[in-house]
Design a protein with these regions (language model features):
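Glycine- (often His-adjacent) and acidic-residue-rich active-site loop
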Residues: 50-86, 105
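Crotonase-fold acyl-CoA enzyme core
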Residues: 88-201
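C-terminal alpha-helix plus adjacent terminal tail
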Residues: 1-8, 38, 162-167, 187, ...
Length: 254
């Protein structure tokens, strides 16, 4: 599901779950093990990438179906809390986490990308939070990260208008640090990883800690409000109908 390759102080983690690399418990488990390994090796940089056409297409449809069952509100809240914990751990680890993003980074997949310290996107990447279309909200404190990184106006475009944007526009809005074309993305990302890894490990750890320390309290408050909103939405008929319609469309695609 995730292969590992170490290059001196760089740990390269390549996701290979399915074409969309959708998130379920097994992928979260694998990502947590990767973070454990980065801690064990005291890696300076964790380079997260995909061998599939897409970085991460969001929640797995099997998990979404689970949210519509009789105890679905509890299941959704549990999934959201677990994803939030994973994303917060990515922020908290002293290792610099760098996402190389090609293809889709949607919903929780965008949340995963935004939790990383550094991002490089291909020009053809597709970025968005389509959850509102089906009566939900993006999980894992994604709304706050999106607003912090791109500003309120851009966040409104993605969240309220439901815009799906390409990598070039995401880069213009401040959601990626670097932009590359599809053919050179892997090479360009490797070069950035090597450049970062040459920095002082001690200075990088302290720089990361200071960058995130100021907003930690407000992030915790937002996570609580987010969980309350999920519970309300998944218990309401209109969002449930939209989710059901989405699952039917996905099933019909084969």
């Amino acid at each position: 599901m995730i292969s590992l390759d170490s290059h001196e102080s760089i740990l390269v983690a390549t996701i290979d779950r399915n074409d969309q690399n959708t998130i379920d418990d097994s992928l979260v488990d694998a990502l947590e093990r990767i973070l454990d390994e980065a801690d064990r090796q005291q890696s300076v940089l964790l380079h997260l990438r995909s061998v599939r056409p897409h970085f991460c297409g969001g929640a797995d449809p099997v998990r979404v179906r689970r949210w519509l069952e009789s105890d679905g509100a509890a299941a959704l809240t549990a999934d959201s809390s677990r994803w939030s914990s994973l994303f917060e751990r990515i922020e908290a680890t002293p290792t610099i986490v760098f996402a190389e993003i090609r293809g889709n980074a949607l919903g929780a997949g965008l949340g995963l990308a935004l939790a990383c310290d550094l991002r490089m996107m291909s020009t053809s990447s597709r970025i968005g939070v389509p959850e509102v279309r089906v009566g939900l909200l993006p999980a894992g404190n994604t709304i706050r990260r999106l607003t912090e990184l791109s500003g309120l106006v851009a966040a409104q475009r993605l969240l309220i208008a439901g815009d799906i944007i390409d990598g070039a526009e995401a880069h213009r809005l401040g959601l990626s640090h670097w932009l590359s074309d599809d053919n050179s993305l892997q090479r360009d990302a490797a070069a950035v990883a090597q450049r970062v890894a040459k920095q002082s490990p001690a200075a990088l750890r302290e720089a990361k800690r200071l960058l995130y320390s100021a907003s930690q309290e407000s992030r915790c408050q937002t996570a609580t409000i987010e969980r309350q909103a999920f519970s309300l939405l998944i218990s309401s008929e209109e969002p449930r109908q939209r989710i059901e319609a989405l699952l039917v469309r996905l099933a019909n695609r084969g």
